[in-house]
Amino acid sequence: MQIEDFDFHLPEELIAQTPLKDRTSSRLCVLDKQTSEITHRSFKDITTYLQAGDCLVLNDTKVLPARLYGVKSDTGAKIEVLLLHQQEEDTWEVLVKPAKKVKVGTEIIFGNGKLKATCIDLKDHGGRIMTFSYTGIFYEILDQLGEMPLPPYIKEQLPEQDRYQTVYAKEKGSAAAPTAGLHFTDKLLEDIKAMGVNIVFVTLHVGLGTFRPVSVDSVEDHDMHSEFYSMSESAAKTLNEAKAAGRRIISVGTTSTRTLETIVRDHDGKFVATRGWTDIFIYPPYKFRAIDGLITNFHLPKSTLIMMISALAGKEAILHAYNEAVKEEYRFFSFGDAMLIL
């Protein structure tokens, strides 16, 4: 299967640069995966498509203000550091720019010495392992000095940091938001719960690999990035009960989907309390074992995410829906509109 098979024409002006004022006022493209029928709604109408007994699975990861600007302690040269994931308490894998200026032993100072980092190892593609030193609480210092690492296709400044955060974000660790969840408000979640829908949380820390372009011609040759995930005992119990009773599991976002599909793949079709790293790569003709439906945003052409949803609804149906969305001038990508595949 070729990467080109997942291409579509997207006018640049349809890439949403800022979030809408009201989270639930996004548009919703509903795709019936059995009939390929498309319906255009507003996101606040999502309750129309949910029913008592459904499980709605949300990713409660929290985006770190992971972009830091510092200077080398010896030369004063400016260095940008992007936190990727924590290895030990004060040791992180990071991306640095310009990479050639950061070698083993290089010390970088942030915020007039409030935070310091020393490079202890080199990785590929500008990656480094760094240990951090500071006085106080690391995440509080990060809140003061760091910036939200917005996706590369967003050129505008973010007016409010919390608009790149879901209202239920809790577990710190992501370099990017699980953007399908940005459409929910506390009120909408309360309304959904009042319908008898089970709200279930899992965690997957979104890495920058989610934005990495596919650089091979053949889908099967792509080397998928890894991300850390976890599921609690109570989440596993609720989901297993739903599956056993034939009730629907609807995941919010491709990150929740990666988590659920990884767990049932690795545990004989069951949900279990677990944590680990997943590099699952979902593309046609993958057969989903965990989910019955998916709420997601509109993805980049030729991306691994459009491949995933093509496995769920069929490539032709997805590309037809995307072409319809372009024609209807939907807003695309992280701050854009949503799609429900059911």
From Swiss-Prot:
EC number(s) from the headed UniProt entry: 2.4.99.17
One GO process term, biological-process aspect: tRNA wobble guanine modification
Cellular component aspect of the GO annotation: cytoplasm
Keyword DNA damage found: no
Organism: Oceanobacillus iheyensis (strain DSM 14371 / CIP 107618 / JCM 11309 / KCTC 3954 / HTE831)
Name the record gives this protein: S-adenosylmethionine:tRNA ribosyltransferase-isomerase
Pathway field: tRNA modification; tRNA-queuosine biosynthesis
Family to which the UniProt record says this protein belongs: Belongs to the QueA family.
Function comment: Transfers and isomerizes the ribose moiety from AdoMet to the 7-aminomethyl group of 7-deazaguanine (preQ1-tRNA) to give epoxyqueuosine (oQ-tRNA).
Annotated compartments: Cytoplasm
Organism lineage: Bacteria, Bacillati, Bacillota, Bacilli, Bacillales
Top EC class for this record: transferase
